[in-house]
Regions:
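Flexible "arm" and connector segments at domain edges
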Residues: 1-124
Length: 124
């Protein structure tokens, strides 16, 4: 069975190339531009996710649209993968960094997370 994260990264690379963005050939200047573009797009998708859940305490007519929430989460993955690719992260590198950061997060929780030590992130 293919690695699902690898498949998602490959599919996103193909979609981005079809749109006209190839992270393999970007200059550093283009990378900065696309990091900002993807970060803004992520912010917009997060806002759309928020609007998909009933958060307006003053409105009684709201309903939870779970299907739309799922779609927004997937949209977030699209831009998050694009962002990872724009900064040169592969699926394997994301996985490895996630595993290391998860270990740091657990250690912080075990210690009561009373102090945030940025040195914890140096090895990630």
């Amino acid at each position: 069975m293919d690695d699902k994260l690898e498949v998602m990264f490959a599919m996103q690379k193909e979609l981005n190339r079809r749109i006209g963005q190839d992270t393999d050939t970007m200059t550093d200047e283009e990378r900065v531009e696309w990091v900002l573009n993807y970060a803004r797009a992520l912010g917009q998708e997060l806002a759309e996710l928020v609007d998909s859940v009933p958060w307006k305490w003053w409105a009684k007519y709201q309903q939870f649209d779970q299907q739309n929430v799922k779609v927004e989460v997937v949209d977030i993955f699209h831009f998050l993968i694009s962002l990872a690719q724009a900064v040169g992260l592969s699926a394997d590198e994301v996985f490895e960094a996630y595993m290391k950061k998860n270990k740091v997060n657990f250690a912080r929780q075990d210690a009561g997370y009373v102090v945030k030590d940025e040195a914890d992130n140096k090895g990630i």
